[in-house]
């Protein structure tokens, strides 16, 4: 049975999964993904997964993280990353007509994350719902530091040394253990990009 790692999750997914998080939870290794190297051996995992984590790092931290993931992956191992892409922000601020699903996202995100959680920076209540949602995704109370574009993410992974770098639809994967692993729900899927990349043999 292959061994997998999930970064920034609150609970293990199964016997072949390890989990690392800043917070302390049962069955979870307490660790800081910006304090490298990661506390794992070289060539230890068949796969490394993170969802809506990489945007919490500055770009240089994200690059260093992916470099160290390459170290802990076995040859042929795969990293899967899910994140809110820059392109979705561009859609929100473009002024173009939104699809019904995108409009549904705006209403949900605005009512819960902007009004209730106050993700958008102060002083922007005069802006449109779309603009406030974009600001909320960009900043999230100062917790989001960098939103990668899809092409930028793929090019960076290739430059680091990964191969077979591919975008996937939400919940789909080239790795059986990664299929249907992402958080369920249309809202999450609408503002998520998915990339997988392989460590060379």
Label for each model-derived stretch:
Residues 2-89, 195-199:
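Conserved SAM-binding loop
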Residues 61-68, 74, 78-201:
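S-adenosyl-L-methionine-dependent methyltransferase catalytic module, highlighting the catalytic core
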């Amino acid at each position: 049975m292959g061994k997998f790692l999930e970064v920034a999750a609150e609970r293990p997914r199964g016997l072949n999964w390890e989990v690392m998080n800043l917070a302390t939870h049962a069955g979870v290794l307490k660790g800081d993904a910006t304090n490298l190297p990661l506390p794992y051996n070289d060539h230890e995992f068949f796969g490394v997964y993170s969802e809506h984590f990489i945007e919490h790092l500055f770009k240089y931290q994200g690059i260093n993280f992916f470099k160290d993931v390459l170290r802990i992956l076995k040859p042929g191992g795969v990293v899967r990353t899910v994140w809110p892409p820059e392109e979705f922000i561009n859609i929100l601020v473009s002024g173009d007509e939104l699809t019904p699903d995108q409009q549904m996202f705006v209403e949900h995100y605005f009512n819960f994350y902007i009004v209730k959680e106050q993700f958008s920076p102060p002083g922007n209540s005069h802006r449109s719902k779309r603009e406030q949602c974009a600001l909320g995704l960009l900043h999230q109370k100062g917790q989001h530091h960098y939103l990668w574009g899809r092409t930028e993410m793929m090019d960076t992974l290739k430059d680091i040394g990964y191969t077979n770098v591919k975008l996937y639809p939400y919940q789909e994967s080239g790795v059986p253990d990664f299929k249907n692993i992402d958080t369920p729900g249309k809202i999450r899927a609408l503002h998520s990009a998915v990339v997988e990349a392989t460590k060379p043999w």
